[in-house]
């Protein structure tokens, strides 16, 4: 996810708590391409999910019993589509607030003929709170979230202690929370938060980062970064 340089909105105190929560994103009104709009028009009825106050039944949703994985903030959907294509044995639910990314993913779903992907165009916290059963997920992926690198904005980083403990509630025992970032300061923050969070173990050992697992696609951005000597840090913590 690219760096966000917009100023965060002020937080009001006279509105409900779920609306006062400091959000990790600023909703930008990006323009959809015609192809993205067409994909939403044609694919959303089958693959799109609308936020409700009702827990999902994954077996009914996907028409089968299979491990279910959520990716939070899938960007333009390239990695999620690649994983779903490479691992048809898994179910994938993508959550993204930016509509062009939703359109881009649905376009890939159509092109690849994927049937194991469903999509929310919503705030991930709201989806978790209202629709995901506890102890149900095989994995949660958080790849390249906004680093909010300015000191005054770091409180907006999605990975905080409360969020880490929330994710643990939705993972099945043995389920994994996999994070990746290309900002070293955020990698250190992630390691600090996750090492202190209850209910997890670092699969690579205390304080250790994990080599990129084969299932996480190497992005074009990463490939360019590697050529320039830039680092990428993966962390994988298992619910115990």
Curated annotation (Swiss-Prot):
Please name the GO terms that the record assigns under molecular function.
Answer: tRNA (guanine(46)-N7)-methyltransferase activity
Cellular-component GO terms for this entry:
tRNA methyltransferase complex
Q: Which domain of life is it from?
A: Bacteria
> Which InterPro entries does UniProt cross-reference here?
SAM-dependent_MTases_sf, tRNA_(Gua-N-7)_MeTrfase_Trmb, tRNA_methyltr_TrmB_bact
Q: In which pathway does it act?
A: tRNA modification; N(7)-methylguanine-tRNA biosynthesis
Which top-level enzyme class is recorded in the Swiss-Prot or TrEMBL entry? transferase
> For substrate, which residues are the binding ones?
150, 182, 219-222
The alphabetical list of record keywords is: Methyltransferase, S-adenosyl-L-methionine, Transferase, tRNA processing
Binding residue positions for S-adenosyl-L-methionine: 71, 96, 123, 146
| EC numbers for this chain | 2.1.1.33
Residues of the active site are 146
Write out the catalysed reaction: guanosine(46) in tRNA + S-adenosyl-L-methionine = N(7)-methylguanosine(46) in tRNA + S-adenosyl-L-homocysteine
Spell out the NCBIfam families in the cross-references: tRNA (guanosine(46)-N7)-methyltransferase TrmB (TIGR00091)
Reported function: Catalyzes the formation of N(7)-methylguanine at position 46 (m7G46) in tRNA.
| Family affiliation | Belongs to the class I-like SAM-binding methyltransferase superfamily. TrmB family.
The identity of this protein, by name, is: tRNA (guanine-N(7)-)-methyltransferase
């Amino acid at each position: 996810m690219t760096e966000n340089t917009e100023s965060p909105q002020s937080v009001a105190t006279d509105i409900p708590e779920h609306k006062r929560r400091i959000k990790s994103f600023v909703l930008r009104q990006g323009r959809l391409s015609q192809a993205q709009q067409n994909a939403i028009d044609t694919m959303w009825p089958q693959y799109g999910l609308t936020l409700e106050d009702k827990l999902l039944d994954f077996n009914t949703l996907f028409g089968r019993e299979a491990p279910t994985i959520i990716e939070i903030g899938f960007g333009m959907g390239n990695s999620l589509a690649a994983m779903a294509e490479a691992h048809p044995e898994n179910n994938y639910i993508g959550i993204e607030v930016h509509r062009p990314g939703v359109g881009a993913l649905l376009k890939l779903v159509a092109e690849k003929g994927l049937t194991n992907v469903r999509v929310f165009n919503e705030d991930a916290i709201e989806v978790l709170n209202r629709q995901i059963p506890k102890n149900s997920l095989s994995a949660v992926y958080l790849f390249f979230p906004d680093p909010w690198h300015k000191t005054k904005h770091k409180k907006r980083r999605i990975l905080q202690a409360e969020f880490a403990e929330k994710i643990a509630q939705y993972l099945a025992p043995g389920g994994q929370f996999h994070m990746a970032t290309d900002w070293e300061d955020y990698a250190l923050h992630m390691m600090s938060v996750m090492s202190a969070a209850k209910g997890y173990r670092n699969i690579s050992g205390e304080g250790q980062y994990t080599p990129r697992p084969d299932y996480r696609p190497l992005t074009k951005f990463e490939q360019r970064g590697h050529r320039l000597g830039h680092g990428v840090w993966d962390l994988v913590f298992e619910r115990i």
